[in-house]
Design a protein with these regions (language model features):
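Solvent-exposed loop/turn and edge beta-strand elements of beta-rich ligand-binding domains
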Residues: 1-556
Length: 556
């Protein structure tokens, strides 16, 4: 048996924080007699259980400065030797070197024991049938002295956890604690708010208009133990969203590095997202698979190998960002108002560990879910007479949105801007499922016996409080304002219902005098009272002047 002392200063620092285990050094003084077993504890929350494979057996004692000294190295088993040598030879160790001492010294030279090499070594050990010892996280276990490769048990990796690169630990002497470090992928969802061309957690939109959603994933840096890396977005849409355009509109992009934003494509105030990737982003749509469930409620987007998409392991070492953009408009069954909204939820499936089978679903675990929400509103416009505020039927109105489309009788929008609507017996016209913004109203024809107003007047729906960090924090405030002779009456954010009136004067009534512009209305009648008082006051002054003038003439 080889009596040399073996030193492995890099076996621990590179792969994990090892409390109570430091570099192995040559002894400078007499040491305590070695024992046959040592205690090890795997702490942290990476996984709940681990498999420990012994590579080398050794006599281990504590040295100075918390170092450990290993002597009398030997292969722990034939299976360990047969699994390790091919891996080391393929990694660059001369094929003429086959002894345990040569293998140990090569591993300790020039930091050969990388996380990628340790992962490959673990794969060979797992496939060789080598015997392992099961370890429970947080519980001390007694192992034979020597070098052990600690591998997270894939079956014990739960939601929000991830297996790390294997950890090489020297067991013996004083108790050893190892703490695997792992960062898990993250996922987020946003929806495009067209009024400011920005991705937000909440937005409002017109029913049936294109509505773009963005899924974004962050793959952390340092995942060097993986040969391939695939992620899968799993999206669940509310009943108020139309899934028919998802597959055709889906675009997927990737960028190197875990740090940075997610602006993979341009956005416009027309409510559309571009398709050309921004600088630093690569379109990988052709490498991805989108599958929409038959019921249209869920769909998945599975990427190809992100390591290959980024050009290799060196680029992937810094992590990655993945963005998926798709179109899912609000449909006719959507919720109106803020009481429920129309939520859209996503979570990310990612490989359990470097050893997981990524060909199916079993090798993946998942992140917590994230969501975004879309809202829409209803505006009821009632035609009323100034003589008693009674509803008027038969008014022909042109109602145009901020894209130049006009409302048609069936509730759709005419892109040519030629459609009109006519008020019914209740005097009402309802703009159902509309985005916030300005609507322009014209009156081509007034009801019989009434005078139509000239020109165009606007009614503005405003939704504030949509730009929030989380959907749960969204408390949109809904208001309506209008230009005379339109009048804003009420706004109920919970139901999304807004009320406004259009006031007509009877034919033959002198038009009211305006002094520039149109007075905005919020439903407060005080301004009308003030205006009436002013008119009455002006009339009294005129009468007084006439009386005075008339009296003078009589006197002459």
């Amino acid at each position: 048996m080889n009596k040399k002392v073996c030193s492995f200063p890099i076996l621990f620092a590179l792969l994990a924080l090892v409390v109570g285990t430091c570099a192995v050094v040559f002894p400078a003084s007499a040491q305590a007699a070695p024992t046959s077993t040592g205690s090890i504890t795997v702490s942290g929350t990476v996984a709940s259980s681990y498999d420990a494979y012994q590579i080398f057996s050794a006599n281990v004692v504590d040295g100075d400065s918390d170092a450990k000294i290993a002597t009398d190295l030997a292969w722990a088993s034939d299976a360990a030797r047969d699994a390790a040598l091919p891996v080391l030879h393929s990694a660059g160790m001369p094929k003429s070197q086959t002894t345990v001492q040569e293998a140990a010294e090569w591993l300790n030279t020039d930091s050969h024991l990388t996380s990628a090499l340790s992962a490959q070594l673990a794969r060979f050990l797992q496939s060789s049938g080598a015997v392992f010892v099961a370890l429970n996280a947080g519980t001390a276990a007694e192992l034979h002295c020597g070098y052990w490769l600690i591998v997270a048990d894939d079956d014990a990796i739960a939601q929000g956890e991830v297996g790390t690169a294997p950890i090489m630990a020297l067991v013996g002497g004083s108790a050893v604690t190892v703490k695997p470090k792992a960062a898990t992928p993250k996922v987020a969802k946003h929806v495009l708010e067209d009024s400011i061309a920005a991705w937000q957690k909440a937005a409002d939109a017109t029913v049936a208009d294109d509505l773009y959603w963005r899924l974004s994933a962050t793959v952390p840096a340092g995942l060097t133990a993986y040969d391939t890396y695939t992620v899968q977005f799993v999206d669940t849409m509310g009943a108020g969203l139309d899934s028919s355009k998802v597959a055709a509109s889906m675009r997927v992009y990737v960028a190197a590095g875990a740090d940075g934003g997610f602006d993979a494509v341009s956005t416009g105030k027309d409510g559309r997202a571009g398709t050309e990737p921004a600088k630093g982003w690569t379109d990988i749509t052709s490498q991805c698979a989108t599958k929409v469930a038959a019921d249209g409620k869920t769909f998945t987007v599975r990427t190809g190998d992100l390591i290959a998409a980024l050009g290799g392991a060196d680029a992937f070492t810094a992590g990655a960002r993945v963005v998926a953009v798709y179109n899912a408009p609000l449909n006719s069954a959507c919720n109106h108002g803020i009481a429920k909204g129309n939520p859209n939820e996503v979570y990310l499936r990612y490989p359990r560990s470097p050893f997981a089978d990524q060909s199916g679903d079993a090798g993946f675990t998942r992140t917590p879910s994230d969501d975004a929400c879309a809202y829409t509103w209803d505006l009821a416009l009632t035609k009323r007479g100034s003589d008693g505020d009674k509803p008027l039927a038969g008014a022909v109105l042109s109602i145009a949105d901020d894209r130049g489309r006009t409302l048609a009788a069936d509730g759709t929008w005419d892109a040519e801007g030629k459609a009109t609507v006519t008020t019914g017996e209740d005097g009402r016209v309802t703009v159902s499922g509309v985005d916030s913004g300005k609507l322009e109203v014209r009156e081509p024809k007034a009801p019989k016996g009434y005078t139509a107003f000239e020109g165009t007047r606007s009614v503005t729906v405003k939704a504030e409080g949509l730009d929030v960090d989380q959907v749960a924090a969204a408390k949109p405030k809904l208001t309506v304002t209008a230009e005379s002779p339109l009048r804003a009456d009420s706004a109920d954010g919970s139901t999304g219902s807004l009320e406004a009136s259009l006031i007509n004067t009877p034919a033959g009534t002198p038009p009211s005098i305006t002094t520039g512009g149109f007075m905005p209305s919020t439903g407060d009648m005080a301004m009308f009272t003030a205006a009436a008082v002013a008119v009455v006051g002006a009339a009294l002054i005129v009468v007084a002047l006439l009386v005075k003038r008339g009296g003078g003439s009589h006197k002459e």
